[in-house]
């Protein structure tokens, strides 16, 4: 059944650009596909099946089947698991579901709350990719005897002179390289990202041509375990002390008022400070978890010359190298240099928040991902 349906596919350009980079006859290859129940991973599974390889779909159940699971466009919960199973049944391959709720809660959700408690701005999607998705799925795929693990992430795996390299996706609006900086070289050697060379509209066209029920399913939005976007409510439930009040203090030392909890603030924020009578707009400059203070100041006080990176992961030698640094998921990469895990911007940057990641790209080949690290500390520009 599966070969007949896939043969009717009318997206030759998209198919030509989807490559699993496996040597030898595909009929002798086994591909494990990480399936979230969305259109992207479903199309990856379809392309894998079309290649002639043996396909095994795997879905990790990451949180409960309660109210969160009812939201359309979520990830790895009730309806999403059923959607993944339906795709596997339609295309004719085996599908496994593994319960990873406890690990997801311990390594992603609890860590998310702890970061806010520490006055940092977390990125749970990176933590999830680092642990539950890539580390756990990597091990599972190995145990299943797979030749590779394929995912629906929009990033490219390119073979360079020294082995596999990570590059940005062709579709800049969909590029997810910022969230994948912690992928190790060992993982990159085993991973495949067949959608990295495709645009999203082509992916949806492939899904429609296959008659997949997820073809029109909305993309995942916000943080998957915060379905209504109210992250403060979740953190408050897990860590009630996160809403302890404290002082709002100007960078000159003047106490301006009181705040309702550090979880409501992040570096660079302007709205929500609610301090009137100031000569110029105020921004959150830093958060002091020890004293429960929100430090504010004019925009010029946000300028930083660099940052210290922790838990860095490098896919190439970056020491003393000219790089482009991206310090927020939606930020434009800016020129910088790295020395001993200390990032120095060639021009001051604004709104650089501890807890976020600094992801580095090759200054010459602007698409290549060199790795990155977590922003532990920033240095005020003189």
UniProtKB/Swiss-Prot annotation:
GO molecular function: ATP binding; tRNA binding; tRNA-uridine 2-sulfurtransferase activity
Gene3D superfamilies named in the record: Adenine nucleotide alpha hydrolases-like domains, HUPs, Translation factors
Keywords: ATP-binding, Cytoplasm, Disulfide bond, Nucleotide-binding, RNA-binding, Transferase, tRNA processing, tRNA-binding
Catalytic residues, chain numbering: 128, 224
SUPFAM superfamilies per UniProt: Adenine nucleotide alpha hydrolases-like
Chief site of localization: cytoplasm
Listed GO CC annotations: cytoplasm
InterPro entries: MnmA-like, MnmA-like_C, MnmA-like_central, MnmA-like_central_sf, Rossmann-like_a/b/a_fold
Reaction(s) this enzyme catalyzes, per UniProt: S-sulfanyl-L-cysteinyl-[protein] + uridine(34) in tRNA + AH2 + ATP = 2-thiouridine(34) in tRNA + L-cysteinyl-[protein] + A + AMP + diphosphate + H(+)
Family matches, as HAMAP family: tRNA_thiouridyl_MnmA (MF_00144)
Protein name (database record): tRNA-specific 2-thiouridylase MnmA
Organism: Sphingopyxis alaskensis (strain DSM 13593 / LMG 18877 / RB2256)
């Amino acid at each position: 059944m599966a070969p007949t349906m896939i043969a009717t596919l009318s997206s030759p350009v998209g198919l030509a650009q989807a490559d699993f980079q496996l040597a030898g006859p595909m009929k002798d290859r086994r591909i494990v596909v990480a399936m979230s129940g969305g259109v992207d991973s479903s199309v990856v599974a379809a392309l894998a099946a079309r290649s002639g390889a043996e396909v095994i779909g795997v879905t990790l159940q990451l949180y409960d089947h309660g109210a969160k699971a009812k939201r359309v466009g979520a990830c790895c919960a009730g309806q999403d698991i059923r959607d993944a199973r339906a795709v596997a049944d339609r295309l004719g391959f085996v599908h496994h579901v593994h319960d990873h709720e406890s690990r997801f809660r311990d390594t992603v959700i609890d860590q998310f709350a702890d970061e806010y408690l520490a006055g940092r701005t977390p990125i749970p999607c990176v933590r999830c990719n680092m642990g539950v998705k890539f580390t756990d799925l990597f091990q599972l795929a190995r145990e299943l005897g797979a030749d590779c693990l394929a995912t629906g992430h929009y990033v490219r795996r390119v073979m360079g002179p020294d082995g596999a390299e990570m590059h940005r996706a062709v579709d800049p609006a969909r590029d997810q390289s910022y969230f994948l900086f912690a992928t190790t070289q060992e993982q990159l050697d085993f991973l495949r990202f067949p959608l990295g060379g495709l645009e999203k509209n082509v992916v949806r066209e492939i899904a429609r041509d296959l008659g997949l029920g997820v073809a029109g399913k909305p993309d995942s939005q916000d943080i998957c375990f915060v379905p209504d976007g109210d992250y403060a409510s979740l953190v408050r439930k897990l860590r009630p002390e996160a809403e302890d009040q404290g002082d709002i203090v100007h960078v000159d030392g003047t106490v301006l008022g009181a705040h309702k909890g550090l979880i409501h603030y992040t570096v660079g924020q302007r709205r929500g400070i609610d301090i009137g009578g100031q000569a110029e707009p105020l921004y959150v400059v830093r958060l002091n978890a020890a004293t429960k203070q929100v430090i504010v100041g004019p925009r010029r006080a946000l300028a930083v010359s660099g940052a210290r990176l922790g838990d860095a992961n490098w896919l190439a030698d970056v020491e003393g190298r000219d790089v482009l640094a991206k310090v927020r998921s939606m930020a434009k990469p800016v020129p910088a240099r790295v020395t001993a895990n200390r990032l120095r911007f060639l021009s001051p940057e604004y709104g650089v928040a501890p807890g976020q990641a600094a992801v580095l790209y090759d200054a010459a080949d602007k698409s290549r991902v060199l790795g990155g690290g977590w922003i532990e500390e920033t240095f005020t520009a003189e």
